[in-house]
Amino acid sequence: MVRQVKKSSLKKNKKVAANGVVHIQSTFNNTIVTLSTLEGDTVAWASSGAIGFKGAKKGTPFAAQIAAEKATKEAISQGMKKAEVLINGPGSGRETAIRALQAAGLEITLIRDITPVPHNGCRPPKKLRV
């Protein structure tokens, strides 16, 4: 169904603290999930595009779910147990990514939406016709 993209990089399996932060950047076109320590050092990350989805499929909730599962499994293998979740963006993969984090075994302590909302700033782009 989805072709896996192989990466040839050396990864250090360093143990990290049990607490961390999950950043979910969800746009209309892609979803990026980054797990980091409380200090901000990246532990694991995954995106819909890096998983192997292409084009419009990157923006789907299913692609966000797979990306969240992959990043969470990698972080749990390095010792992370609990995490705060910071969600940014208007995309369709927001809730699905959170459910995937919980299903993968990560205990969520806090969910915070940090999507920037203008106080009537710049004119937005034209309405999307779906």
UniProtKB/Swiss-Prot annotation:
Cellular compartments annotated: Plastid, Chloroplast
Keyword Manganese: no
One Gene Ontology MF term: structural constituent of ribosome
Any single biological process term in GO: translation
PROSITE patterns recorded: RIBOSOMAL_S11 (PS00054)
HAMAP family attached to this UniProt entry: Ribosomal_uS11 (MF_01310)
Self-association and partners: Part of the 30S ribosomal subunit.
Name this protein carries in UniProt: Small ribosomal subunit protein uS11c
Taxonomic lineage from the root: Eukaryota, Cryptophyceae, Pyrenomonadales, Geminigeraceae, Guillardia
Gene designation per UniProt: rps11
